[in-house]
Amino acid sequence: MNKLILFLLLFICFSAIGQENKERQISVNKVGILFSKAKQNNLLFFDKDYDYKTNVYKFQLFYPIQKGESWDVNIILQPQFQKAQHQLLNEQFITPDEENFEFLREKFIQKKDISLYAFEVALQLRKSIIKNISFEATLGLGAGYISLESERLAKGFTFIENVSLGLAHKINKSEFFLATTVGHVSNFNIQKPNSGYNIFGFELGYRIFIK
């Protein structure tokens, strides 16, 4: 249900983009890079069954949709690469009724490196707080490919969902960005298993204005 809501939200956003395009030309006004470091076991999430940590590298293209009196609205296109590490901590998570359960326990209890390649579209709300400092709230949804299976998620096609809250500091023709982020990775029950991963962490970004 949560993914359906996100899909509808992004559909509305793209409809708005199409309408805006009829009235004026929309083009990129900023490009940026963003680094995020997040993990499963933290202040918000804790699961004794597994450990999951990830470093995320994003390239960002910012499209201004609306400039309002209170809030500005932007769409961000974000191709990205995620380098994660996963380990099963509680072997009882794999129950004896599963086929080859002993083999699977031995396989997933080993620490493994996982790669995730994804393309994400995000809706950003931005509000100026004081001169050159703005608050940003961003909601993103994307699709990608994850390189290895685990007891929680199948290898292959997957969805990513991200929410971030942070501050941007403008300096001349560039700006720095610092935020907290919450994310989820799963595959919408296209494959089994689909327990997914939850993460919480921090983001650091740098952007350059090109308009």
State where each predicted segment sits.
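Outer-envelope beta-barrel architecture signal
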Residues: 4, 23-31, 69-75, 131-137, ...
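Gram-negative (and chloroplast) outer-membrane scaffold detector with strong preference
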Residues: 58-146
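Short glycine/proline- and aromatic-enriched beta-strand/turn motifs that initiate or cap beta-hairpins
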Residues: 18-69, 209-211
